[in-house]
Design a protein with these regions (language model features):
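PRPP-dependent phosphoribosyltransferase catalytic core
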Residues: 2-13, 139-186
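Short glycine-rich phosphate-binding loop at a beta-alpha junction
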Residues: 64-75, 153-154
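Short, glycine/charge-rich flexible loops or terminal/linker lids adjacent to PRPP-binding catalytic cores
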Residues: 35, 80-123, 133-136
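Phosphate/pyrophosphate-binding loops at sites that engage ATP/ADP/AMP, CoA/4′-phosphopantetheine
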Residues: 55-67, 139-145
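Active-site-facing substrate-recognition patch
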Residues: 1-62
Length: 186
């Protein structure tokens, strides 16, 4: 079984819920027949290993050379850390960073935590893309901080509510490891 298939199985077991009736309320307020809470996998050791490997491989496949990888806390945090860890093991370190939902009210009041400097090339990541709203918030914060966005990579694209298109309208390419089609038949 491939690493990708293993990840799909883990998500099915730990993070995916389906109902014939649209009973799940999404962040957008829309009701859906299916729901993913990927934290059940992104914070689970076997999931961490698989996500780190698959995301790192995707970065290599796309021939990207980021200094950092991160996104809006907290969905992106374990993904960024798993990629950073994998990148170190493979001899090509990529720093993890986290975009705060609101800058701290004390200290340096940084909107981004990590070792990024203005001008650094980065990848913005997301756990689940639905409308693209949280990804766009991260993109805006990253750009305001002066980082250069190479692309967006999502763990899962729900392929609805124009999420991918909304993100691409910000002028960045969007890729995903998985889509809803990996979990339900159309």
């Amino acid at each position: 079984m491939t690493e990708r298939d293993q990840l799909i199985d883990l998500i099915r077991q730990r993070s995916f819920q389906y109902s014939k009736e649209p009973i799940f309320t999404l962040a957008s307020g829309k009701k859906s027949n299916f729901y993913f809470n990927l934290k059940g996998v992104t914070y689970y050791p076997p999931g961490i290993v698989l996500i780190g490997a698959l995301m790192y491989d995707k970065i290599q496949e796309l021939n990207l050379d980021p200094a950092g990888i991160g996104g809006l806390t907290m969905g992106a945090d374990p993904i960024a850390i798993s990629v950073a860890y994998t990148s170190q093991l493979r001899g090509n370190p990529i720093d993890a960073f986290s975009v705060r939902k609101e800058p701290k009210a004390h200290g340096l009041r940084l909107p981004i935590e990590g070792n990024m400097e203005p001008g650094d090339p980065v990848i913005v990541i997301e756990d689940v893309v639905t409308t693209g709203g949280s990804t766009i918030k991260a993109i805006n914060a990253v750009r305001d901080y002066g980082l250069e966005i190479l692309s967006v990579i999502a763990l899962l694209d729900r392929c609805e509510q124009n999420g991918r298109e909304n993100i691409e309208a910000c002028g960045v390419n969007v890729y995903s490891l998985l889509t809803i089609n990996d979990f339900i038949s159309q």
